[in-house]
């Protein structure tokens, strides 16, 4: 057996102690109402925090708000230690690292997550993955597990390269708060390159950080100018920079106009200044930040593509409206021929997003990340998009039937039969889809407390063991050695 195999076997042996729950356990934690059985000697050996907590004369506060202390002799401690500083999932991830030296700070692929609406998401750089990494980083710092903190920083640095700009700004704030200079540098450059104007950044970042972002943009612009060739066309780079600045100014003016519902000014910019609404992401911005009337007026200009894919993920305005669970936005977009079947780069349709949110409500109840969603609005959005998809499917079927009829010869009477069967099958499929839709979205009106109570039931030890068995081995198999 090689050294690597020996270490892997040792790691699994220790991890099995955690998975087996009460086996040889001498300490119990309560996290979000669930019991977690662990072993003091392992925790004390792997973490200075736990070493002081269990054996030191002055254990740190916070892990046990009741103020109970462990006596120096290490005798069994009565009662359960409450943990209020971190969540259950993050606490288990941290314990997995302490026991095995390995961990994967990425949710299981395709696992439904409360703050990820994409069905089939691999959770490599979505909001759910970023939030889990940030929570794990905070826990690692709080409990003094520096190796886990370093691993999480590396994970975040790779995530932000593909994450949304909102998540990048979230990581930027955390990196400043926890003095993570390398992560700060990476995120600040990404925000600077995003082109978002200060008035938009102000919705997410404090003023002092915005000032540093603007300062970085100026330095980057000067550096870019100094690296440009000067031997021919000496003023060419000045013209390019001026053109880029002009486009930025146009986009800022356009967004200010949309914020103030001044669609006429946007129209003048399109006609007189050649503003490209698709490249300026006017419609996604309006859907996310403005009223239904502004979006409708913008669409009626006829200068914006309602199905234009924005950003690296390729989301259309209808994807955004579905994530927002806004029936008004969904309706006005569908009225202007938004495609309910259009897919993102990852193959997700607006209908997929709404079905995932519906599933979370039906089977999980009220969970963090979904509290802002009203079931009635979700039901209405699902009905609108489902109906639009069925109408489009029916129209495509009719077009196919018409083409088949035109290509058929007059003497081929048998062609009527497959035509009849196609309509019959389509009608049958249409009825099934309608039934599926009704079964799904009508249940949204049910009492979500049933799901919540279902989650809270069951034995704590079995819940702990099942949670580790379902997730720990996944994390272990894709982990990193430390």
Curated annotation (Swiss-Prot):
Residues 395-434 are annotated as: Disordered. It is a peripheral membrane protein. It holds the Pfam family Ank_2. Disulfide bonds: none annotated. Zn(2+) binds at residues 116, 121, 123, 126. It comes from the Eukaryota. Induction: Induced in roots during nodulation. One of its GO terms (cellular component) is cytoplasm. Pathway: Protein modification; protein ubiquitination. SMART domains: ANK, BTB. A zinc finger (C2HC NPR-type) spans 113-127. It is found in: Nucleus; Cytoplasm; Cell membrane. Expressed in the shoot apical meristem (SAM) at the base of the developing leaf where stipules are formed. Associated with functional and vestigial abscission zones (AZs), including pulvini. Disruption phenotype: Altered morphology of stipules and flowers. Altered abscission of senescing leaves, leaflets and pods, and of petals in developing fruits, even after complete pod senescence; this phenotype is associated with a reduction of cell organization and/or differentiation in pulvini, organs present in abscission zones (AZs). Partial loss of nodule identity characterized by the development of ectopic roots arising from nodule vascular meristems. Belongs to the plant 'ANKYRIN-BTB/POZ' family. 'NOOT-BOP-COCH-like' (NBCL) subfamily. May act as a substrate-specific adapter of an E3 ubiquitin-protein ligase complex (CUL3-RBX1-BTB) which mediates the ubiquitination and subsequent proteasomal degradation of target proteins. Transcriptional co-regulator involved in the promotion of leaf and floral meristem fate and determinacy. Promotes normal stipule growth and development. Required for the abscission of senescent organs, probably by regulating the cell wall disorganization in abscission zones (AZs, e.g. pulvini at the base of leaves). Involved in the coordination of the symbiotic nodule developmental program. The BTB/POZ domain mediates the interaction with some component of ubiquitin ligase complexes. This is BTB/POZ domain and ankyrin repeat-containing protein NOOT1. It comes from Medicago truncatula.
């Amino acid at each position: 057996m090689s050294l690597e195999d020996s270490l892997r076997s040792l790691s699994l042996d220790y991890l099995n102690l955690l998975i087996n729950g009460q086996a040889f356990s001498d300490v119990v934690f309560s996290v979000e109402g669930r019991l977690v059985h662990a072993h003091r000697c392992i925790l004390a050996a792997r973490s200075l925090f736990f070493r002081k907590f269990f054996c030191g004369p002055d254990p740190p506060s916070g892990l046990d708000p009741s103020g109970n202390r462990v006596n120096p002799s290490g005798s069994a401690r009565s009662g359960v230690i409450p943990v209020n500083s971190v969540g259950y999932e993050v606490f288990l991830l941290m314990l997995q690292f302490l026991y095995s030296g390995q961990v994967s700070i990425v949710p299981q692929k395709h696992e439904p997550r409360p703050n990820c609406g994409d069905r089939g998401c691999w959770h490599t750089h979505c909001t759910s993955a970023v939030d889990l990494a940030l929570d794990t980083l905070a826990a690692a710092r709080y409990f003094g597990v520096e190796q886990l903190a370093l691993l999480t920083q590396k994970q975040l640095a790779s995530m932000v390269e593909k994450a949304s700009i909102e998540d990048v700004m979230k990581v930027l704030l955390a990196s400043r708060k926890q003095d993570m200079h390398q992560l700060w540098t990476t995120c600040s450059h990404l925000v600077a390159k995003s082109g978002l104007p200060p008035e938009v950044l102000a919705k997410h970042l404090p003023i002092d950080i915005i000032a540093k972002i603007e300062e970085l943009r100026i330095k980057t612009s000067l550096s870019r100018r100094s690296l440009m060739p000067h031997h021919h066309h000496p003023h060419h780079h000045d013209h390019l920079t001026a053109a880029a600045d002009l486009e930025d100014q146009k986009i800022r003016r356009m967004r200010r106009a949309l914020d103030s519902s001044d669609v006429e000014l946007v129209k003048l910019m399109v006609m007189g200044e050649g503003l490209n609404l698709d490249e300026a992401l006017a419609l996604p911005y309006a859907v996310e930040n403005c009223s239904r009337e502004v979006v409708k007026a913008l669409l009626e200009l006829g200068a914006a593509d309602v199905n234009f894919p924005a950003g690296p993920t390729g989301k259309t305005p209808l994807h955004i409206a579905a994530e927002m669970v806004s029936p008004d936005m969904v309706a006005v977009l569908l009225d202007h021929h938004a495609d309910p079947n259009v897919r993102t780069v990852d193959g997700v349709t607006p209908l997929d997003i709404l079905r995932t949110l519906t599933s979370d409500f039906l089977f999980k109840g009220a969970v963090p990340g979904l509290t802002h969603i009203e079931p009635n609005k979700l039901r209405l959005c699902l009905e609108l998009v489902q109906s639009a998809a069925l109408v489009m499917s029916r129209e495509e079927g009719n077009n196919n039937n018409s083409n088949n009829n035109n290509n058929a010869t007059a003497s081929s009477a048998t062609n009527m039969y497959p035509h009849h069967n196609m309509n019959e099958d389509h009608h049958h499929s249409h009825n099934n889809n309608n039934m599926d839709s009704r079964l799904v979205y009508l249940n949204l009106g049910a009492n979500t407390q049933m799901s919540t109570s279902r989650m809270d039931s069951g034995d704590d030890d079995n819940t702990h063991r099942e949670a580790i068995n379902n997730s720990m081995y996944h994390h272990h198999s894709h982990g990193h050695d430390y």
